[in-house]
Amino acid sequence: MKWLVAVLVVFVAMFQYRLWVGEGSIADVVRLEREIARQEADNERLRERNKQLAAEVDALKTGDDAIEERARSDMGMIKEGETFFMIIDDQ
């Protein structure tokens, strides 16, 4: 009977140790849940960015207006007959 109690105490101690310390412990689970939440937030931010980029690609494929806007803003291009004015801020 004493052996049975001793063996049961050892098993309970092993299970308690695993519950509180090491891989699969409560602290480990909480850390992983936080990491999952952070990763899901990052994924949502990246999904929104991908939607914006896909819309921009679609606009560039279908219309000349988007291409013209991109050429003007990124490359400083102007149309024939236009005059370019650059306003420099003194600050």
Curated annotation (Swiss-Prot):
Residues 1-3 are cytoplasmic. GO terms for biological process: FtsZ-dependent cytokinesis. Keywords: Cell cycle, Cell division, Cell inner membrane, Cell membrane, Coiled coil, Membrane, Transmembrane, Transmembrane helix. The keyword Nucleotide-binding does not apply. The chain crosses the membrane at residues 4-21. It is a single-pass type II membrane protein. Belongs to the FtsB family. NCBIfam families: PRK00888.1. Essential cell division protein. May link together the upstream cell division proteins, which are predominantly cytoplasmic, with the downstream cell division proteins, which are predominantly periplasmic. Part of a complex composed of FtsB, FtsL and FtsQ. This is Cell division protein FtsB. The lineage of its organism: Bacteria, Pseudomonadati, Pseudomonadota, Gammaproteobacteria, Cellvibrionales. The gene is ftsB.
